[in-house]
Amino acid sequence: MMIEGLEKMLAKGVDNALLRFGLGKGYLDAGDAERAAEHLQRCVEQDPKYSAGWKLLGKARQAAGDLAGARQAWEQGLATAATHGDKQAEKEMTVFLRKLDRART
């Protein structure tokens, strides 16, 4: 239901980082990681300082099997979070990256 309303807003020409984040989260929660990643990519293109967008983009890419893409998103998000003092997002993405590293060995 939430996705439907957000898609209607997008179709009417409303497009911003928060809307794209909502769509990305909705699609990820619904199990459509690839579509989620598309919206989250647009989210961080529109607001590169949005560390939560980078964090969720990494999760969506990971869920879609794109581990290199997940790493890239989390590394970018980590730099963004550190620059803007978003300590919680910084901690979470550091943990996600460590888990990716452990999975490779």
UniProtKB/Swiss-Prot annotation:
SUPFAM superfamilies: TPR-like. The keyword Repeat applies. TPR repeats lie at residues 17-50, 52-84. PROSITE patterns: TPR (PS50005), TPR_REGION (PS50293). InterPro entries: TPR-like_helical_dom_sf, TPR_rpt. This is TPR repeat-containing protein PA0015. The keyword Transcription does not apply. Signal peptide: none annotated. Keywords: Repeat, TPR repeat. It holds the Pfam family TPR_19. The lineage of its organism: Bacteria, Pseudomonadati, Pseudomonadota, Gammaproteobacteria, Pseudomonadales.
